């Protein structure tokens, strides 16, 4: 290296150290990209820039990666550890790959001919200054003078990202394609294409001029026809109907501002640091990969809190991906939040489109336009925030519009990315509990925002886990090949409804497959399983350890996030959380861990986040506990009868065969932990571990009681209507919750009973005429009687006096 260049770099390092704060993507490239530090690495940058090279060096040293300014010594040769792809006088407007770059690639390839153990890793790296894609009417980026570079350093110094890409194995390249000069040229060309794709995935398409977009949409034949129909139906002039359509567009459409996104990034960085001890992000590489491959990405998260809108966009921005346009409820379009959300990417949607064809047409075409222009989109498939902590039944309208846009000729593959979002504390959880007890939902407004801000404090950990993507084109090709048939105008395809329902359910399953187990929801689950919401410290720790071993040894799914802390560390963490409701008390016998009564209701919310993970082990434990001695055949038969209802209610992913395999693994683990004994084909209770078995079994207790209530009503009155069945089931459940101290508000939630009756219908418990199939109902009711305490059965039977009133209503 020349002394002049060395001097220049030393001078340049000073302003960089003051002005630039960069973020590496991914944050741990060695593990996330699978880099082998025992083998040489060569960094490839897209264009010549000493500034970018020095920023890369700083990040490499911080990440324990080889210094790019130190040469690789291979077979007695010293070769540069970095290379610039082209001159870079214009951003992504190349004069061609530098000849010395191709020459260096060839020299590295040639070294592999004589050393089979050598595997040089070629790592593409981009240094991004700012993330604004610009407007559609803006000119292409021009030559940057030194003065302009200084301005960029000042303006974007805190908005700088170093993006490491998947390494290319030169050993593999040589084995597959040889080590000729043509291969070196091909490597350089492929690298150029990769950098162009990477820039697009980080910045996205140009932002539209809002009015120009409106002018285009308002002239679409479908909207023109809807305007004419509106004018005819309401007997108003067409110009007035057109004004209404324009007003709807203005109400709906986002108005993205990169300046707002940058400001939001600063504010949210402060907010997360104030609120949470950490935000745990998993599987973001899935999203980066889809973005690089040019997919239209649709993010579909579960909806726990209004914080979800902000958190997901923030995480995506810091993962080097364009934040999406977000479908937000019209209730959030209030000052000052509405304008801020709109400029941050929110587009607003009314609660219902029913009876408003003009609105539904305009909204559908706006959504399709976002897809066609290449903007990623986010919508909440549950339709609203879950008040119980469970996933709600999916609302399929947005999925339907997505498939319709695809069928109309979207030229890129669509991938739906389910996202699990979880918190150790949800700001609105107190409000949810009140609403479940019958309080009216409070309308969002500025005063409500201020009240929430006052609650800002240590809220523990947050979790964002990107689930397995659903590649819609491939899914439809496999399950609904007729989707490729040309659509008939004004005729809804027969396959569409079934496909929409199937994809919506799969999204929910994949969200649950990506759940995060944390200290609060696990310890809360254990305490809620105890009769008095209290356990000795020793028993609590033993139960938590039992669950951790179960989750590790009998995996629910490969996407689940499990704690890395010990049971003791998890307990200390929860005890330190404000308003957790978990308290430590000491007496002459030792330390007790207790959950106070008021907090018990709130804790059910967090338990419900992960209830689907332990419901199957709980069912197995309950079968052994209540039978005292149970054969594997009995266990399998019982699970086979009850599992379909659990699968529908909790969006479980096992099919009929897989669930029996999972049961076998659970039994093996219970035997290994000595919770049960195994003799021949019979499993019996290990009295020494009886408390542990009881706590495992309690996880499904309330669910089985709900099922038994509805089935008992069906047996008493087979002609009962579905509506009345759900109503009377809820009444009995409310009575049961009072008499037996059940603190879970969802125990008598209308939606859960509705899901159960729908499952009964789907599983053939009603015939084609809607009559109850008594034999099937009696069979499952008989199974449930063996799994429910006599006291609870008597309470339910006592409440069955209401059946006489039902009969009178039916007559």
Curated annotation (Swiss-Prot):
Which key words are in the record?
Answer: Acyltransferase, Cell inner membrane, Cell membrane, Lipid biosynthesis, Lipid metabolism, Membrane, Phospholipid biosynthesis, Phospholipid metabolism, Transferase
Keyword Membrane (UniProt): yes
| A Pfam short name | Acyltransferase
Localization recorded for this chain is:
Cell inner membrane
Pathway, per record: Phospholipid metabolism; CDP-diacylglycerol biosynthesis; CDP-diacylglycerol from sn-glycerol 3-phosphate: step 1/3
GO CC, one annotated term: plasma membrane
One GO BP annotation is: fatty acid metabolic process
Is this entry keyworded Acyltransferase?
yes
Q: What is its EC number?
A: 2.3.1.15
How is this protein situated with respect to the membrane?
Peripheral membrane protein
As annotated in the record, motif HXXXXD motif runs over 303-308
Top EC class, one word: transferase
CDD domains in UniProt: LPLAT_DHAPAT-like
> Looking at the record's lineage, which domain of life comes first?
Bacteria
Catalytic reaction(s) noted: sn-glycerol 3-phosphate + an acyl-CoA = a 1-acyl-sn-glycero-3-phosphate + CoA
Q: GO terms for molecular function, please? A: glycerol-3-phosphate O-acyltransferase activity
Chief subcellular location: membrane
Q: Which SMART domains match?
A: PlsC
Q: Which family does this protein fall into?
A: Belongs to the GPAT/DAPAT family.
**PANTHER family named in the record:** DIHYDROXYACETONE PHOSPHATE ACYLTRANSFERASE, GLYCEROL-3-PHOSPHATE ACYLTRANSFERASE
Q: NCBIfam families of this UniProt entry? A: plsB (TIGR03703), PRK04974.1 (NF003441)
The free-text domain note is: The HXXXXD motif is essential for acyltransferase activity and may constitute the binding site for the phosphate moiety of the glycerol-3-phosphate.
Query: What's the protein name?
Result: Glycerol-3-phosphate acyltransferase
The species this protein belongs to is Haemophilus ducreyi (strain 35000HP / ATCC 700724)
């Amino acid at each position: 290296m020349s002394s002049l260049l060395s001097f220049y770099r030393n001078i340049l390092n000073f302003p960089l150290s003051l002005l630039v704060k960069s973020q590496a993507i991914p944050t741990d490239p060695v593990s996330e990209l699978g880099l082998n530090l025992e083998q040489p690495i060569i960094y490839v940058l897209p264009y010549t820039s000493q500034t970018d090279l020095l920023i890369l060096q700083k990040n490499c040293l911080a990440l324990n990666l080889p210094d790019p300014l130190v040469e690789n010594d291979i077979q007695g040769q010293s070769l540069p550890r970095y290379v610039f792809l082209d001159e870079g006088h214009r951003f992504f407007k190349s004069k061609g790959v530098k000849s010395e770059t191709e020459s260096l690639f060839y020299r590295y390839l040639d070294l592999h001919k004589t050393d089979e153990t050598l595997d040089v890793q070629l790592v593409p790296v981009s240094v991004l200054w700012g993330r604004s894609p610009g407007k559609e009417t803006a000119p292409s980026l021009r030559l940057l003078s030194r003065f302009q570079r200084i301005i960029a350093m000042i303006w974007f110094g805190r908005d700088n990202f170093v993006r490491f890409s998947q390494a290319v194995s030169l050993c593999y390249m040589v084995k597959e394609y040889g080590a000729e000069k043509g291969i070196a040229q091909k490597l350089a060309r492929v690298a150029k294409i990769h950098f162009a794709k990477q820039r697009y995935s980080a910045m996205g398409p140009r932002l539209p001029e809002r009015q120009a977009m409106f002018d285009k949409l308002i002239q679409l034949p479908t909207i023109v026809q809807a305007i004419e129909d509106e004018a005819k139906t309401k007997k108003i002039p067409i110009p007035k109907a057109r004004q209404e359509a324009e007003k709807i567009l203005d109400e709906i459409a986002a108005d993205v501002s990169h300046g707002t996104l940058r400001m939001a990034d600063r504010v949210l960085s402060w907010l997360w640091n104030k609120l949470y001890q950490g935000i745990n992000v998993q599987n973001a590489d899935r999203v980066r990969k889809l973005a690089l491959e040019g997919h239209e990405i649709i993010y579909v998260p579960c909806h726990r809190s209004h914080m979800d809108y902000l958190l997901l966009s923030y995480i995506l921005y810091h993962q080097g991906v364009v934040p999406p346009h977000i479908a937000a409820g019209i209730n959030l379009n209030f000052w000052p939040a509405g304008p801020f959300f709109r400029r941050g990417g929110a587009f607003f949607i009314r609660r219902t489109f029913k009876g408003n064809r003009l609105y539904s047409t305009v909204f559908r075409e706006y959504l399709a336009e976002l897809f066609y222009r290449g903007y990623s989109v986010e919508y909440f498939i549950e339709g609203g925030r879950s008040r119980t902590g469970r996933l709600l039944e999916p609302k399929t309208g947005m999925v339907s519009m997505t498939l319709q846009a695809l069928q109309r000729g979207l030229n890129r593959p669509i991938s739906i990315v389910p996202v699990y979002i979880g918190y150790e504390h949800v700001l609105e959880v107190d409000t949810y509990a009140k609403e479940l007890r019958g309080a009216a939902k409070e309308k969002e407004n500025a005063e409500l925002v201020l009240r929430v801000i006052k609650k800002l404090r240590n809220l523990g950990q947050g979790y964002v886990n990107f689930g397995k993507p659903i590649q819609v084109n491939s899914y439809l090709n496999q399950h609904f090949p007729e989707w490729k048939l040309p659509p008939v105008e004004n005729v809804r395809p027969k396959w569409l409804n079934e496909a929409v329902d199937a994809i919506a359910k799969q999204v929910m399953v994949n969200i649950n497959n990506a759940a995060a187990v944390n200290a609060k929801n696990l310890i809360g689950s254990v305490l809620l399983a105890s009769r008095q919401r209290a356990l000795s410290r020793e028993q609590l720790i033993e139960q938590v350890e039992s669950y951790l071993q179960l989750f590790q040894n009998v995996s629910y799914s490969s996407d689940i996030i499990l704690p890395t802390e010990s049971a003791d560390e998890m307990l200390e963490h929860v005890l330190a959380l404000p308003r957790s409701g978990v308290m430590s008390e000491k007496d002459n016998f030792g330390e007790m861990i207790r959950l106070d009564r008021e907090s018990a209701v709130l804790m059910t919310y967090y338990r419900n986040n992960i209830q689907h993970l332990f419901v199957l082990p709980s069912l197995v434990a309950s079968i052994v506990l209540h039978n005292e001695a149970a054969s594997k055949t009995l266990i399998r038969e019982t699970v086979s009868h009850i599992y379909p209802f659990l699968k529908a209610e909790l969006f479980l992913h096992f099919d009929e065969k897989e669930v029996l395999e999972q049961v076998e693994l659970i039994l093996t683990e219970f035997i290994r932990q000595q919770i049960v004994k195994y003799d021949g084909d019979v499993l019996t209770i290990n009295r020494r571990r009886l408390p542990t078995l009881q706590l495992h079994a309690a996880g499904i207790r309330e669910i089985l009681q709900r099922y038994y209530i509805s089935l008992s009503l069906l047996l008493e009155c087979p002609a009962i209507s579905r509506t009345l069945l759900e109503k009377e089931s809820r009444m009995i459940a409310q009575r049961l919750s009072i008499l037996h101290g059940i603190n879970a508000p969802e125990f008598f939630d209308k939606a859960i009973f509705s899901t159960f009756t729908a499952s009964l219908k789907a599983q053939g418990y009603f015939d084609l005429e809607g009559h109850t199939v008594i034999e099937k109902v009696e069979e499952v009711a008989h199974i449930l009687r063996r799994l429910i305490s006599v006291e609870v059965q008597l309470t339910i039977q006592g409440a069955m006096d209401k059946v006489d009133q039902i009969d009178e209503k039916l007559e």
